[in-house]
Amino acid sequence: MKNGIHPDYKKFLIKVGSDVFETMSTHPAGEILMDVDFRKHPAWNKDIGNVVNQSNKSISDFNKRFSGLSFGSQKKEAS
C-alpha cells in the first residue's frame, strides 16, 4: 500500500438523542449529530409507517374515497 494517499481511518461517533454509537470512519469530523432517529423511520419500522400514512390527510382522504374499489376478479352477486 502506498503511503500518504489514503485518508485517516479514525474513531467516529454517531449521536442520536441520548444514544451514542461508536464506529470507524474517514469522515473529517469526529462526530455527527442526527436530528431524526433512524430506528423510528417508516422504512425500518412497519408499525410507524401505518401511523404516518393514516395521519397524512391526502392519503387518508384517498383511502376513504376509494375504500370500496378493488382490483382483480370478484364474484358478482345475483340480482
UniProtKB/Swiss-Prot annotation:
Entry's Gene Ontology molecular function annotations: rRNA binding; structural constituent of ribosome
One Gene Ontology term, aspect cellular component: ribonucleoprotein complex
GO biological process: translation
Pfam families per record: Ribosomal_L31
Keyword Cell division applies: no
Keyword tags: Ribonucleoprotein, Ribosomal protein, RNA-binding, rRNA-binding
Function: Binds the 23S rRNA.
Assigned protein family: Belongs to the bacterial ribosomal protein bL31 family. Type A subfamily.
Subunit structure and binding partners: Part of the 50S ribosomal subunit.
Protein name, per record: Large ribosomal subunit protein bL31
Lineage: Bacteria, Pseudomonadati, Pseudomonadota, Alphaproteobacteria, Rickettsiales
